[in-house]
Amino acid sequence: MAAGTLASSANAAERYIGVSATGTVKVKPDTVRLNATVAVVAGTNKDALAGASASATKLRTALGANGIIPSYIKSNTLTVFPEYNYTADKGSTLVGYRATQSFEVIIRNASNAGTVVDAVVAAVGDSLAIDGVTPYVYDNTSATEKARVDAVARAKAKATSYARLLGVKLGKVTYLEESSSPSPFPIMMAMAKSDAGATQIDLGQQDVSISIVARWSIA
């Protein structure tokens, strides 16, 4: 929300009109972040880790076959731990060891995200869990500049309005401060199957906002 102020002092040069304004641009995400985990349970921790590693290899192969370069694939966690089954009569019983490895994958071609998801699920099978897909704008430089232009235009229009209402004339800009509002983290979108059976990722829109505070001297 914008606000306006009129300030003065003994020195006429310090008299000014100050306003705040926010410019916002809506952008369609061009990239999707995929979070996935492979998990295998086996009789020994060695076998569990080997199984998870084999599943991870299938995941990487499927990603590469669908145009995902290695620098867009990052391991987030790697765990191996005993797994127990609890019953009231026997208490905790060791049933094996679970190994997991989680990944963050950047899919630069957002429109291809559903195809990538289908490919990794088919390649890895039941040892794969899809933890989430998050559409976002990979580079918001252009959108930020447009939001900045919008913010300045709104601020100037507001200051001009105050000047007209107060019967004064605007001089030069004497102060400007920008605060770039963090773009809200995109909500994780649910995956849906199309009529043809392929997974679709709904990209939605993302707001890119710039807020400014500006002062104009009173001529």
What are the residue ranges of the model-derived segments?
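Short, charge-dense linear interaction motifs
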Residues: 1-219
